[in-house]
Amino acid sequence: MIERGKFRSLTLVNWNGFFARTFDLDALVTTLSGGNGAGKSTTMAAFITALIPDLTLLHFRNTTEAGATSGSRDKGLHGKLRAGVCYSALEVVNSRHQRVLVGVRLQQIAGRDRKVDIKPFMIQGLPVKVTPTEILTMTMGDRQARVLPLQELKERVEAIEGVLFKQFNSITDYHSLMFDLGVVPRRLRSSADRSKYYRLIEASLYGGISSAITRSLRDYLLPENSGVRKAFQDMEAALRENRLTLEAIRVTQSDRDLFKHLISEATAYVAADYMRHANERRLHLDDALTLRRDVFGSRKQLASEQYRHVDMARELAEISGGESDLETDYQAASDHLNLVQTAMRQQEKIGRYQEDLEELAFRLEEQNEVVAQSAEQQQENEARLEAAELEVDELKSQLADYQQALDVQQTRAIQFQQALQALDRARELCSLPAMTWEDAAPTLAIYKEREQEATERLLGFEQKLNIAEAASSRFEQAYGLVVKIAGQVSRSDAWQTARELIRDAASQRHQAERLQALRSQLNELEQRLREQQDAERLLQEFCQRMGQDYPPEELDVVQQELEARVETLSATVSEAGERRLALRQTLEQVTARIEQLTARALAWLAAQDALTALSEQSGEALTSSRQVTDTMQLLLERERETTVERDEVAGRKRCIEAQIERLSQPGGTDDARLTTLAERFGGVLLSEIYDDVTLDNAPYFSALYGPSHHAIVVPDLSRVREQLDGLEDCPDDLYLIEGDPQSFDDNVFGVEELEGAVLVKVADRQWRYSRFPAVPLFGRAARESRLENLSAERDVLAERYATLSFDVQKIQRQHQAFSRFIGAHLAVAFEPDPEAEMRTLNGRRGELERELSDHHGQNQQSRQHYDQAREGLQLLNRLIPRLGVLLDDTLQDRLETVQADWHDAQEAARYLSQHQKALDQLEPLVAVLQSDPEQHEQLRADYEQAQQTQRQVRQQAFALTEVVQRRTHFSYSDSAGMLSENTDLNDKLRQRLERAEAERSQARDALHAHQAQLTQFSQVQASLKSSYDAKQDMLKELMQELHDIGVQVDANAEARARERRDQLHMALSQNRGRRNQLEKQLTFCEAEMDALQKKLRKLERDYYQTREQVVSAKAGWCSVLRLVKENGVERRLHRRELAYMEAEDLRSMSDKALGALRLAVADNEHLRDVLRLSEDLKRPERKIQFFIAVYQHLRERIRQDIIRTDDPVEAIEQMEIELNRLTEELTAREQKLAISSKSVANIIRKTIQREQNRIRMLNQGLQAVSFGQVKSVRLNVSVREAHATLLDVLSEQQEQHQDLFSSQRLTFSEALAKLYQRLNPQIDLRQRTPQTVGEELLDYRNYLEIEVEVNRGADGWLRAESGALSTGEAIGTGMSILVIVVQSWEEESSRLRGKDISPCRLLFLDEAARLDAKSIATLFELCDRLQMQLIIAAPENISPEKGTTYKLVRKVFNNQEHVHVVGLLGFGTEQAAPPSTALTETDS
């Protein structure tokens, strides 16, 4: 017995809580035990994802979401994964003991949609020692590992020898391989199949009775009988095709003469036009080639003139360009002259303003000195006035004091005290504390002398200070000149800078004096440089024309070589005439020979066409007339042999068709009366009971029952006995066997199985020995196998018969063709080919024409070389006189040196013109700059100190004077004497006061007068200053304008600019003269070229016109050739004999055929339209399309599948003989293909009975299933009432509805739909077509209804609905149904899978806590009996006694979530439990 495949393990990599975990799956039940959130559902989700990796189906919801139309956005998968690469892999060992690892790579896709990317893969041949975890991860350390990406996994697996890695781009390919390896129970070809499988898994996972499955149990349990449907479709297609073929044959018979006329006229119409276009195209090509040669010759002839014209045009362009440059230079020179003149006028204005400015500066300096002196005098007057006022004040103070003393002379003590105070003040001021009033007078004399000395000293310092201030004004003047010339410099460096300026002025004067000489030298060098540039241009032009660079030193030698070359070329050009004359004579002889051969080619071509046709038909290379007659004799012998073989094949074919007809009957019986008798007796044919027997068991049962394999099995023979009396319509031998048709076994006979045979003990004294037949026919599988072989053999024979019939007719046509060839073409067919010689002569003619063309080209080339050499010699003659200038290499350097010197001299002249006067003024004042007046501050300080000393001595003298004056106060001899003395003193003081006031008045008057004079001097100074500033601003503006002009002028600048302008005007005049000369020469050259150009234009116009015709016709001709070659009509259209006819004859032939075709296709709209389109002369391809359309029309009408040829002409020849035979054969075939409605009803009925029996067999596996109050589960199959009525009418009342089934307009499916609608008018067929409804009625599944029933408690059998059952009962019932569905799928797919493969069986059950222990035990028993694996999830408190249990505990360690797993074997088994192992996954 074949061992069933098993899932060995499930591996999760990088799932939520599982980094790398492998669950070893039990052979029966694997339990995942754990609390809420332990990871049970995640484990099952990983298993289902690896099994069905379809994101459109996957939706892992918990039980609280059951029935919800929308769950979480990621459908439960995204949240179960970790970031990065994840894997879910299933390890499977199938029936072949192949270890296969199938799984998927999952990866989260970033985004709000929470999508997951899935890639399925497969690893086959992995060694047993390598675990899935080891292959999917890579160990990085003791406690760390890395998940491998899919590409690295592929590379790692492929590195292991003998291991196959395959990645799948589609889920269909993935499931196809899983089906072939026995992983899934059925082939999942489409998304609908995957949806069914997923719904089954989903129903298993969440438990209960799935309405999605119970509502469509027919689709899950009943296999599609595609063979029956395909047989009906093939039958209808064959009948339709047969009827169409018969109709086509009848139409073809009536149109055969028209077709002959149509194809002959179409061939003449299209072939004549085809060959006419081919001839015209060849002629146009020849004309185009001739014109092209003439054009090329004329172009070469014109080339020399064009070269000369181009050279002159180039020289004219250069001269015109030079003229433009000269005009630009001349205009620039004129503009420069205007600028120089403007600058000169501006320079004159600047000079005038500078003179005025210098004069104003001189007057301003003088006025400044006057104002300074006046200001000094004003200061002296102010000082005198201040001293006078001070003296007046002092005298008034003294006088007041004395007056006061006189007023209070009664108070002598006060006076005496005042005297003492005066004495103390004198002591303090004089620093003489011991001085007495008696010593005051001598001391006063001393201080008077000191006052005189201080005054004299002060006057000395004042004189020195005045002298220093006068020197200061000259220093400032000299320093201002230095700053004006050299810019800002320090006062300490002013003297050194002034000396350098004076020295530089001498060198600047020397350079300025050389300006005129340098200008003359510069003009001369510029003129020589222009001459050198002209020489270089001539040399470059000469080298360009000669195509080679020549150094100037070799020009003399080159001139001699050119003169010799011109003489040689002149001699070569004169030797061209004789060679051309000889070539023309040879060309005329070749052309005459070609014309002779053309006249002989027509008859030979017609014979060759006939000979080629014979060679193609016979397959022999006919090279002589003897071979033609021998081949004709062989054809007669081959015809006799083929006819005999055809008759033999026809007999064998009839025999096989009889066998096929017998085996096609229901049950394989060749007697339809047996079916009627079986229905009459209420029994079943033995062959129908064993209709499902496999092909391997068919020989055994065929030998077992022997002659009774067509027996009728009845429940009770005694009931049949009465009906046997008077039975007439029955076979000669009728076998009846008593037994239950629903549970029939083969224990009817005593049987002993032998090697290749059986021994049947019919009775004690009767044995039957039967060998296993070589070709068993017992059972549907055996009959179908035999029918398949017979059908293939019949098809081969039919094809062979058709081939032989065609060969006979082909041989007859060949014999007739040979006869016609011998009579018409045998005399000329084997002569030499005239066209071969014509092709040789045409090649020779082309060579001669090319040789003539080449000769003409060489002659033209020699002439061009001659003209080029002559023009080069002319240029060289112009260049030789300038050779000396051309060889002067130092000219540019000398020019640059002189230009640099001239620019320096020009800068020196401009410098002197700007600063000459300032330098002249500075030169005598240089010495003043040696000492800075700012260094004489000490002198001013000494002056002030002397002034302070004078003032102090004066105060001391005044104090002493006061003491001396008060000395009388020290003696109060008597009051009168004191008053008298005081009166004298008062008078003196009054006199001094008067003198002081007079001096003060004089000083004040002098101050006022001098102040008015100072004001007048200041106004004059301000006026001069304002005028000076205005002129200085104007001078700056003029200088800026001169700078903006950008021209540096000197005395000769205007003369040089005018000279440059005159020189350019002269050069421009000469250039214009040369240009006019060249224009005249060009006009003359163009006049000479007009004749050649007119000729060339005419030739080009003719050539382009001809070429345009060729090119425009090329696209159409290419499309014509493409159509001809693609459709294989070149042999019909390319008639070489028409190539020798004139275009008018071919056009006349085509027009005549067109008139006949218009009448022939008048009734055919398509051909008429195509013919009308083909009359367009601009679209020749449409005639080919018409010819192809005619051939296509003929092929469609004469049925190429009947007349086996690709040529409609040959098909027309075969048609007369073939049509009668095909008519008879097709009529008989239609009778054989027709199927009765009764047969259809029997086939559907038998199929329904077979499936009912199969469902009953499946129910036997559900009898022992019990869950809670449910004692048993079964599937109830019934036939729909409307469909049962349809079957009854088809089998018994078909005569009443023959109007439907005998109609030629309706197919059998359409007739069946019409009958169904007639019997059930209340049923609305909606928008479905009768053909669609009829095809559905041919599917037996639409006749059945399947329901699930349970035997529950006292209620008995009732329909299984979730509302009527407890949760556990519903889970158990639903699980039982799913097991039956899986078993049904396996049986259905057994023929598609390998014989040595028994697929894996596995279902799921989540939340098994809803089942009691007995129900779980029932599930275990069911898994054991059906060899099915089951994965259930249970809470922690449930521990099944069997299978393998995994305890899952989710923990969090260091913020890392992982699942702690402990695997245990069932503790109810006898074997010792393995040690509990725990594997903790830690995320790295």
Curated annotation (Swiss-Prot):
Where is coiled-coil annotated? 338-415, 496-604, 781-805, 835-868, 903-1115, 1206-1265
Looking up NCBIfam families in the UniProt record yields:
PRK04863.1 (NF003422)
Organism domain of life: Bacteria
As one GO molecular function, the record gives: ATP binding
- What is the designated name of this protein? Chromosome partition protein MukB
**UniProt keyword list:** ATP-binding, Cell cycle, Cell division, Chromosome partition, Coiled coil, Cytoplasm, DNA condensation, DNA-binding, Nucleotide-binding
Coarsely, its chief localization is: cytoplasm
What functional role does this protein have?
Plays a central role in chromosome condensation, segregation and cell cycle progression. Functions as a homodimer, which is essential for chromosome partition. Involved in negative DNA supercoiling in vivo, and by this means organize and compact chromosomes. May achieve or facilitate chromosome segregation by condensation DNA from both sides of a centrally located replisome during cell division.
Listed under subunit, the entry gives: Homodimerization via its hinge domain. Binds to DNA via its C-terminal region. Interacts, and probably forms a ternary complex, with MukE and MukF via its C-terminal region. The complex formation is stimulated by calcium or magnesium. Interacts with tubulin-related protein FtsZ.
Query: Which cellular components does GO assign to this protein?
Result: cytoplasm; nucleoid
